[in-house]
Amino acid sequence: MAYAKLGRTSSQRKALLRDLVTDLIINERIETTEAKAKELRPIVEKMITLGKRGDLHARRQAAAFVRNEIADVESGQDAIQKLFADIAPRFAERQGGYTRILKVGPRRGDGAPMAIIEFV
């Protein structure tokens, strides 16, 4: 299995990707480095596929990965509820390819190539 190490240990990498997945579900668009965006894409696609399945086991699998954060303060909806209620139904007719990565300029400071990852 090929993956980028992202300059971190395996536990740090898993924590980073969990945070990025949760942020993407909540905000639907985040700016990060290209390498992180490319690593994030397959994980987010799997989460949306779980959301489309919608059964109890899929919900528990998604809840085991996505952080328990409030997505919408007014409705009190958390990230998992948003994934299953808002995002997954939007892609009901789509077979994969739920995200797009847009390259933006290098980051000021260290010149790291940046990208925006968002839902289609």
From Swiss-Prot:
A biological process term (GO) from this entry: translation
SUPFAM superfamilies in the record: Prokaryotic ribosomal protein L17
Cellular component GO terms, alphabetical: cytosolic large ribosomal subunit
Keywords: Ribonucleoprotein, Ribosomal protein
Pfam family, one: Ribosomal_L17
Superkingdom per UniProt: Bacteria
InterPro entries: Ribosomal_bL17 (IPR000456), Ribosomal_bL17_CS (IPR047859), Ribosomal_bL17_sf (IPR036373)
PANTHER family listed in its UniProt record: LARGE RIBOSOMAL SUBUNIT PROTEIN BL17M, RIBOSOMAL PROTEIN L17
Subunit-level organization: Part of the 50S ribosomal subunit. Contacts protein L32.
UniProt protein name: Large ribosomal subunit protein bL17
Organism: Shouchella clausii (strain KSM-K16)
Gene that encodes the chain: rplQ
